[in-house]
């Protein structure tokens, strides 16, 4: 069932997709996740390494035939898939890590379509019988498979077959926090890409909401203390929930606003900087969706919310890391600027509406009295209601350059979805933006550009020209930031 798109570009075939946006917020991984990643890297020797092969392919350049490179890559991927059913847990983890790297760096839809059932069975066993590290890697691979297969029948079938397992691990309090974290991210991304039924969307929203809502006080009560090991899980669940909000029907958005907008500000006092930033960006997204739903939307506790945002935007507590304070202040300055301008716009609109009514009433009464005194019919003219040209708060625009193209991230919805794909694809994000039809469709980039080697070489600038461009950009950026720093006190 198609769903309304919250982004700027239309979805091909009438299907729904929202715009995404880049965000610096990432879920806290915790020590267990770091150990899982290091162990997986150390055990990739059980399976052939993809990294060394990729480096050799890159160094080969034009000397190696492109078709031969693709065949070599697929041969190694076949070995990784076979290793998923190995009896050794370390071998399975190494195969999952290698698959994760391959799917993030390459586009392989045809290869995956032929082995979709095999991969689904292997991932199901890893999620069912594996331990924390194996479950976390399996969930990460599942999210990448959904990105590779897209919203077609195979992708939808894959997500539906493994969705119950993701929910089971996510809601299991005894499971590893790292496994639950990756299951939350995979559930949100898989539902966004592959779920076509509104009921699936609502069920995923409810499941994710239940994870982070437990850390919020009910009915204005003080939020319960959350263990440090669960901060990453709460952050991932909140970000996945916000991702699905961008494609949520408007009929459900209004209920979510009433239920969650009073609760989310409690997360702004969390000990985790990532969770605080995720909560702030989600609040800004909710206000953006509320404005799209109803221009006269009013939040009753706006003063307290702006006070909390202003405190975080100017936070200088020394017990927090300097890098965390800088990132937090940057994020919350944008959130505060957006929410504060939204409040000012709502107040101005409400004031204009009220005084127009008062003015109209007074004018009619004055003219009526004058007409009665003169015993002549009066003519009351209706005051003109010219539309307001004042613009409310907007998300700071971010420019993403890849190849010869540019992506503009100009809303909180686009920002959240760009960040979701960036988190799962990592350094392969630019490659997928250039070649993955799903991402190009979501962000409105049009068909894939086909450029030969001659065209690419003609577009490539020299090292000296690049140096001049970087120097000019640095100078302009320094001037712009200096002006912002001078006016920062006025904004806050």
Regions found by a protein language model. Give the residues of each.
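N-terminal "cap/leader" segments of large eukaryotic alpha-helical scaffolds
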Residues: 1-106, 459-492
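Core helices of alpha-solenoid repeat scaffolds
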Residues: 70-80, 112-123, 154-167, 180, ...
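Long C-terminal extensions of eukaryotic subunits of large macromolecular complexes
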Residues: 1-24, 36, 320-492
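Long, hydrophobic/aromatic-enriched structural stretches that serve as scaffold segments
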Residues: 129-151, 315-316
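Short coil/turn segments at helix-helix junctions and helix-capping linkers
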Residues: 82-91, 122-136, 168-179, 214-217, ...
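Acidic, Ser/Thr- and Gly/Pro-rich intrinsically disordered linkers and low-complexity segments
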Residues: 78, 177-178, 212-232, 316-329, ...
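Flexible helix-coil junctions and inter-repeat linker/turn elements that act as hinges
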Residues: 104-112, 132, 146-158, 171-179, ...
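Hydrophobic residues within the alpha-helices of tandem HEAT/HEAT-like
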Residues: 84, 98-106, 123, 138-149, ...
